[in-house]
């Protein structure tokens, strides 16, 4: 029996994001071959989104861009976008990511776990810096956003940006895996 190939397209060329989408889909569809590729997709929001709302919109914009740019003969089965952002909540500043998944005419949205941020990091973000650059400076690393991310640094490697995205993607897939029971909306 020939294995089914599931084509996925990720709205980024960042290997962390492509790997997260690939791992999540491989877990959800273990009998299938996952054919993943990435493409640059604009978020339409600031390079460092500073609100929950902007972060969510950035993920949605990226997934829609991927769907619009894909050629008929190379269309993917699923489109993924991950947008990392920060916000200041009642308990303090934190970083998180939104996940947008396009499948046929459906759009699924999810959000990752949050990581509390030190106030000094948040202040640098308010001043216009990106989280990856701030973390690189603080921890003397290079291009951490394409590795373990702030999550890896602040948890001493017990969690990573990729593991956080992978879990969020699996959870966001629930409506697409169970369309009959998710048919009703709020």
Swiss-Prot record:
Swiss-Prot/TrEMBL catalytic activity: XTP + H2O = XDP + phosphate + H(+); ITP + H2O = IDP + phosphate + H(+)
Gene Ontology molecular function terms on file: ITPase activity; metal ion binding; nucleotide binding; ribonucleoside triphosphate phosphatase activity
Cofactor binding: number and manner: Binds 1 divalent metal cation per subunit; can use either Mg(2+) or Mn(2+).
Residues annotated as binding Mg(2+): 75
Cofactors, names only: Mg(2+); Mn(2+)
Keywords attached to this entry: Hydrolase, Magnesium, Manganese, Metal-binding, Nucleotide metabolism, Nucleotide-binding
Family matches, as InterPro entries: ITPase-like_fam, Non_canon_purine_NTPase, NTPase/PRRC1, YjjX_NTPase
Its EC number(s): 3.6.1.73
Superkingdom of source: Bacteria
Any matching Pfam family: NTPase_I-T
Homology family: Belongs to the YjjX NTPase family.
Subunit structure: Homodimer.
Function statement: Phosphatase that hydrolyzes non-canonical purine nucleotides such as XTP and ITP to their respective diphosphate derivatives. Probably excludes non-canonical purines from DNA/RNA precursor pool, thus preventing their incorporation into DNA/RNA and avoiding chromosomal lesions.
Protein name per Swiss-Prot or TrEMBL: Inosine/xanthosine triphosphatase
Source organism: Shewanella baltica (strain OS195)
Phylogenetic lineage: Bacteria, Pseudomonadati, Pseudomonadota, Gammaproteobacteria, Alteromonadales
